[in-house]
Amino acid sequence: MAHTSDGWGAPYDNQTYVEAYEQLEIALLEPLDRILETANVEEFRPKFKNHQDPNDRKNKKNNDEEWRDSIYNIATDESDTDDHEQRKNFFQPPLQVQRNSFVKNTLMEFKRSSQIDISRLAVMGCGEMSLEKGICEYLGSFGTINVLSVDIDEPSLSIGQQLLGKHLERNAEILAVETGLPVLMRSYVGDILEPDHRFADVDAIVSMEVVEHIPLPNAKKFVENVLGTLMPRIFIFSTPNHEYNAVFGMEPGEFRHGDHKFEMNRKEFSNWLEELSIRFPHYQIDPPHYIGMTRGYENLSGASQAAVCRLQVDLNTTLPQEVTPYEMVGHLPCRLGSRLIAYNLVKEAFLDWLEKIELQEHEPRTDGYSPYWIFNVQNILHHLKAPVSFALTIDEKVAIKYIQGMTSRKVHAEYSHGFNGIVILQMHSKEELIKTVQDNTL
């Protein structure tokens, strides 16, 4: 299961962007190890109260509401348990959203303070990929070009792939204007207790609300594998604060979810982090961070308790490259920065076309208030200096809008002659248009 490198250069110029997109398209052609059986989104994790029973017509949501709740994580709040169907929402925004924000802010601060790009980000125990959806628009700010996600639960992973794909599609326009290189988001089926070389030496590993789902000895083994074998530059993980269950009206000793194997109180979690600091001195491990607070219960700190571990010395894994037990089952592109790239490429193509064309050699039309020329925008797009795979993503009408903007509306759109065209008034010289374009920047 050896895979080609997923990395590409830093976003210094248009050519780097274009080459990155070309490499992304090549990476997306790489065959998967296998394809997951598609899980039913409408039956997605019915144990959470906000996801209604799909057979309950009275409470059934339409597809748009279902997608909305799934995408914005309203349906996967840790405060919603099997035994408390009528419980109110304790957290605004939902606790899952707050955890995602904590990860985003922590990674942003790490990038700022270390001046190191988080080029490869791994999510271990990714579940339904709430975190990936929550931070995808910030990946450019992190300097990320590759996200690797792994989970052992295939239905959850299938749901995650569907929801992430839908999220990327719905937010394509927002992502297109974000600064950053395109991001390859790959998903794997695997047991996080088994280290995989592809997850070694990454810049960041995140594992939120995962360890409590496996027996405590295995949870400790997982964390020790990350800090001692995979050795990311930063490792963030969280688990429920057991003391906070009292806020939800739960009985002493009752776990927040039926599938939790253990839960720690604040003292137990703090002691665990102190033990890790002694065993792995090459990591600086913060005191516990707390996420999610309900008014009136400030004395309990927060619903989730998180650890942040930063590598202090430049060490590399000793895990052999052939150790790749995970199966690659999905990949999706997060097309950051594509609009800026397209704009700059169209600008270069338009300038190149203007330099080479002699407007006066073409007979102007005189059926308007001023003589003018009409040109098919395809003639301009033929001057694009980009691989065909990327050039084909630039819509002709969008290219015309770019040209209108960069010429300060001295060029007009024309769609009534059977093609997508531009109109140039004879009063505007080629030299004037070139200067206007060169003076305008996006």
Swiss-Prot record:
It catalyses: small RNA 3'-end nucleotide + S-adenosyl-L-methionine = small RNA 3'-end 2'-O-methylnucleotide + S-adenosyl-L-homocysteine + H(+). Its cofactor is Mg(2+). Broadly expressed in the germline and somatic tissues in both hermaphrodites and males. S-adenosyl-L-methionine binds at G125, D151. It is found in: Cytoplasm; Nucleus, Nucleoplasm; Cytoplasmic granule. Mg(2+) binds at E209, E212, H213, H260. Coiled coil: none annotated. It is an enzyme of class 2 (transferase). Keywords: Cytoplasm, Magnesium, Metal-binding, Methyltransferase, Nucleus, RNA-binding, RNA-mediated gene silencing, S-adenosyl-L-methionine, Transferase. Disulfide bonds: none annotated. This is Small RNA 2'-O-methyltransferase. It comes from Caenorhabditis elegans.
